[in-house]
Amino acid sequence: MKNSLKGPIRAVLFGVGVTGRELIARLPERGVELTGVFARSSHIGEDSGLVAGCAANGVKVSPSDDASIRAVLSETKPDLAIICTTDDLPTLMPLIKPCVECGVNVLSSSGLLYYPYGIYPEGSVELDELAKANGVTVFASGIQDVFFTSLVTVLTGACYSIKSVTLTDLATIDRFDFWPVFGIGKTKEEYEEYLKAHPVDEAHAYSHLAIATNATVAALGLTAVAQHDGLEILYTDEDTYNAYRDLHIKKGCVIGKNETTVIETAEGITFRCEFISKMAEEHKGETGNLNRIVVEGEPNLDLVTTDKHGEMTTTASMLNRIPDVLNAGPGLKTVADLSMPYLKVKPLVDYLEA
């Protein structure tokens, strides 16, 4: 939704986890006024600044039920809702819908909403129509915006021709509260029983890297004709210790997973993805968050980021996308619709188009 604000951008935030707390601290630095914070259960009624480890800001954490959301939106009239909670669209919709219906643009950290048309074809169309009907934009950003899509598309611009693109990403999951769903520390037998009792939900059934690569294919104007997915559960080859979680993991137990995807295009370019999500093994010198992009073509290119600083770059990517979301036309947008992300050094309101 195009904007011509006279004052600062006003935003509400959903989620007080790692990303949410970082945004509470960072939004004021970019001239964004925080007018509301929502959480499912934790910290309700507390000062959100204190929850984030900052000075008190006077913005209390509210419950995220529909009535509470609409009440805060009606009272504070924000320009943007930043949602840093879950990934899957069915769980996100109860948060997105009241925002959209109240005329509030939405920026989400969801890896599935980043390019949802292959996973939620009907839900994506419905969300697009709802956003257009209310004149607002819905968009998802985060680490994938830069490292999984934009860097790849930029590298292709330095080539005469391309045969394939191989993207390998290692993400350590220690600092994120969802790590237990991976079955960390379980034996193979225990993990198989765990899966029977806890079927993989939609939020963890799809590789974020594969979804982002589909977005890259679209951004490059290519046509995907086939996709092949694989999953390997990773087990420790020796006793290991994770310092951040103070967690001992015995040899032969689950430490993470490796999701692989191959996407073939009608234009003859093949995309290969390997997304490794695991607990860091510090004794092996593994800090995690490695990102590598290999382009086979003319010329061959190999770009390695040894540590992409996942927590920080997720938040920074979202902050820098705020003006892009507010400047975009109504509807559900993906990275294929917007310009490349870049650092916004001035107050974010200065980047809004009239």
Regions found by a protein language model. Give the residues of each.
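Rossmann-fold NAD(P)-binding glycine/threonine-rich loop
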Residues: G111-V136
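Rossmann-fold NAD(P) dinucleotide-binding segment
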Residues: I69-L80, L89-G111
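C-terminal helical cap and adjacent loop that interface with cofactors, partners, or active-site loops
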Residues: A280-A354
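NAD(P)-binding Rossmann-fold cofactor-contacting core
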Residues: R30-C54
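Short, ordered loop/turn segments at secondary-structure junctions
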Residues: R40-S42, T86, V104, S110-Y114, ...
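Active-site-lining helix/loop region of Rossmann-like oxidoreductase modules
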Residues: R10, F14, V18, E22, ...
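Short acidic-hydrophobic, aromatic-tinged amphipathic segments that line or gate anion-handling sites
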Residues: G58-S68
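NAD(P)+-binding Rossmann beta1-loop-alpha1 motif at the extreme N-terminus of oxidoreductases
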Residues: K2-E33
